[in-house]
Amino acid sequence: MDESSLEEAIGTYRAQLQQVELALSAGLGSAEQDDLLKLKEDLQQLIELTESSLVSVKKSQLLAALEEASTNQSDTSVPQETALDNEFAAFYAELSEDSNEVKPNPDTDEENEEEEQDISGTKVCAPYRTSWGTLEYHNAMVVCPEEPEGEEARVRVFYIHPTHKSMKPCGFYLEGKCRFMDNCRYSHGEVVCVSELRDFLEADISNMESGSACLAKHEDGIWYPARISEIEGGFYTVKFDSLLLKEAVLEADGIIPPLRQDDVSSSSSSDSEDDAECDGGYAKVFTSREEDLAQVNTAEFCGWEAHTRGIGSKLLMKMGYELGKGLGKTLSGRVEPVQAVVLPKGHSLDICAELTQRKTAAAIAKNNPTSHKRKAKKKKASTSTRHNVFDFLNSKLGDRAQSASHSSSSLVTGAEAYRGGKSTKRSLNVRLFEAAEKVTQVEREIQQLTKSLSKRNGRDAAVVSRLEEKLAASRKLLEQLKAQEQAIQREQKKADTHKKMTEF
């Protein structure tokens, strides 16, 4: 059967199926409905079979048409190919006749290709420019040569010991499946000039011992700064500098010496510090002389951002900052970064200030110990004499003042109030502040009560009487609080007069 007859048969079968469905919806007897249902199923199967045969007929027709088209193309392509061959032959003949130029030496081309093949896979020390502008050298491997930039030959390298995500080779790129290309977080190879390459540095861990600084390989394939805590049986237990990384047990190929020697020197100098109380809670603090003599190393500038995303230096660069120069419009501002001060946990600012004063005094004593001793002796003598004389007078006069003037709520003795010490002044200030807060709070309550009384005047006698009682009680409380505030102010004046009389 051809395509048209099959389509006509499908149309008639569908019309019969519609008639059967109409008969079923008419509500005939049960026996007739069973016959109609069987007829409906038969018609549906028949329609499916004819549709499948129609599809097979269409496929066979399409295949036949494609075969005819391919045979026609092959017949027409033969004269075209012969014409193209003739044109190429004429072109090559003209080139052979007109070429008087010197032919390149094939030996030199072969040598260049051999050199390019030889350099691929070699281990070198390649430069890496960080996002904050510093230049570092890392061990790397040459992957392939790149197009030269002018006369400079260039190669693509992958770093062997990546210290950042941007240095770690992208696994999908190596397989040719990376979809991000230039926007990938990982490295697709660094293109560097051949003149910038250095000799490969072998990792020598023979001198490393417990407590030595190193670079250790983490589970994510990145090498982080760490410190060796234990060496046993060829295995190294390392503790990473970052608190987010756990301890790890690695073999010898999992650690290398640090890239910069200042890490080692800083570790040795930190062990030799004596003042544990002050240095345990603070970062390094420079004295005035050290700040004058301090020189800025541009290679280490913004070095702290090796462990961050480097947003600070990026913002500076966007605002026009030039690396190594001063801040400001005229580049005359500060060059060195601000030293971070880490305060000890759980201590007040007074204790922190005492620690800083103690540290600066210790630094001054190291520079000039004789003058420090003289000042300490003078201070002891003056404090001892003043303490002995005035303490006796204050103890005698203060007891009387306490019994006469101080109320039961006062927590400061008369001698302390009259002496006017730091702790006394602080406690008086706190009490005065609390009293003032209470006074303002009670005044607000009185204002609210008066407003509510004015609104309910003549409406509800019980509510009005209740509000009047509250108003009277709050007014009495206000008088008491004001009296307490005045008493604290008198104590403050007493301490101030003592200070004026004792300072000559």
From Swiss-Prot:
PROSITE patterns per UniProt: G_PATCH (PS50174), ZF_C3H1 (PS50103)
Main localization (coarse): nucleus
Domain G-patch: 308-354
SUPFAM superfamilies (UniProt xref): CCCH zinc finger (SSF90229), Tudor/PWWP/MBT (SSF63748)
Gene Ontology terms: cellular component: nucleus
Localization annotation: Nucleus
Zn finger (C3H1-type) location: 165-191
UniProt cross-references to Pfam families, sorted A to Z: G-patch
Region annotated Disordered, chain positions: 95-121
Sample GO molecular function, one term: zinc ion binding
Disulfide bonding pattern of the chain: none
Sorted UniProt keywords: DNA-binding, Metal-binding, Nucleus, Repressor, Transcription, Transcription regulation, Zinc, Zinc-finger
Any single GO BP term: negative regulation of transcription by RNA polymerase II
TM region positions: none
Record function comment: Transcription repressor that specifically binds the 5'-GGAG[GA]A[GA]A-3' consensus sequence. Represses transcription by recruiting the chromatin multiprotein complex NuRD to target promoters. Negatively regulates expression of EGFR, a gene involved in cell proliferation, survival and migration.
Protein name: Zinc finger CCCH-type with G patch domain-containing protein
